[in-house]
């Protein structure tokens, strides 16, 4: 299981339930990386999806204690249920939001992090993998600039 996220300089991932700065390069990387995989997502993140519809070309698992069903999603009420469902999957990505990242990070062996260097005030955060002794930056896959905003797409592995 791996995590995929875009973070700002303070490792923030969002504000008021949305991603304040979204880069097309990050979205493209996300689509290419998760296509054909199983993705685990939280209810608040799904609320930000267009039409609250599942991501096409993926098996969509919704981790929610309040929702029991949502068309196109397999709904799990707890982490253990989601872990059981993904045991046989070839590729599993945790795609957010903050609560889902925190609950599933201990089960992840790797992470793809797009570092977006934009002046953003976040209210939701991902743990700082650079400061975590259990994680190691193993590669910078891409660097660039979009609309004056610098970014890097990085690969982390659990030690």
Regions from the PLM with identified roles:
Residues 1-159:
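Enzymes that bind and transform nitrogen-containing heteroaromatic metabolites
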């Amino acid at each position: 299981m791996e995590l995929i996220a875009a973070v700002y300089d303070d490792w923030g991932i969002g504000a008021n339930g949305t991603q304040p700065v979204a880069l097309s390069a990050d979205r493209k990387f996300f689509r290419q990386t998760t296509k054909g995989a199983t993705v685990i997502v939280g209810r608040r993140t799904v609320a930000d999806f267009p039409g609250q519809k599942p991501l096409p070309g993926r098996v969509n698992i919704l981790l929610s204690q309040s929702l029991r069903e949502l068309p196109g999603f397999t709904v799990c009420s707890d982490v253990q249920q989601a872990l059981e469902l993904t045991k046989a999957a070839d590729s599993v990505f945790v795609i957010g939001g903050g609560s889902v990242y925190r609950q599933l990070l201990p089960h992840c062996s790797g992470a793809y992090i797009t570092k977006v260097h934009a002046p953003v005030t976040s209210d939701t955060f991902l743990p700082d993998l650079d400061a975590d002794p259990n994680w190691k930056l193993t590669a910078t896959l891409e660097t660039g600039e979009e609309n004056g905003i610098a970014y890097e797409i990085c690969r982390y592995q659990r030690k």
